[in-house]
Amino acid sequence: MTVERTFSIIKPNAVKKNAIGAIYARFESAGFKIIAAKMLHLTREQAEGFYAEHKGRPFFDGLVEFMTSGPIVVQVLEGENAVQRHRDLMGATNPDNALAGTLRADYADSFTENAVHGSDAVESANREIAYFFTEDEICPR
């Protein structure tokens, strides 16, 4: 297997629930190394830029509103087959379809307020990591 990096967001609803530590424990229990992390409150411009590929879709404005509604935690996770393993840990985008024991089954409130984001491919992970982190902020270990 190949060691990969993936990008992850703990979204405002999970931060508000004080679930950061529990989610980090799940990352580490699943074998991920957290090699970069920061908490921030997205501006509208940052959220629109990050989700630019969804502009024009019916859910875009609501997504931007939600993602700017409170602080988020962004992190870079490293591990074998990290992109797919992180997606498996997150569970289905719609929490109603998420398997028990996944992050979305445990922490999501709705399809939009689904607790976490994760990259869908290595290429998008690289782009998303670069959106929030400089190389100097990433600490391989």
From Swiss-Prot:
Keyword DNA repair in record: no
Binding site for ATP: 11, 59, 87, 93, 104, 114
Alphabetized SUPFAM superfamilies for the sequence: Nucleoside diphosphate kinase, NDK
Keywords: ATP-binding, Cytoplasm, Kinase, Magnesium, Metal-binding, Nucleotide metabolism, Nucleotide-binding, Phosphoprotein, Transferase
GO molecular function: ATP binding; metal ion binding; nucleoside diphosphate kinase activity
Xref: NCBIfam families: PRK00668.1 (NF001908)
Protein name: Nucleoside diphosphate kinase
Species, as recorded: Photorhabdus laumondii subsp. laumondii (strain DSM 15139 / CIP 105565 / TT01)
Lineage of producing organism: Bacteria, Pseudomonadati, Pseudomonadota, Gammaproteobacteria, Enterobacterales
Gene name linked to the record: ndk
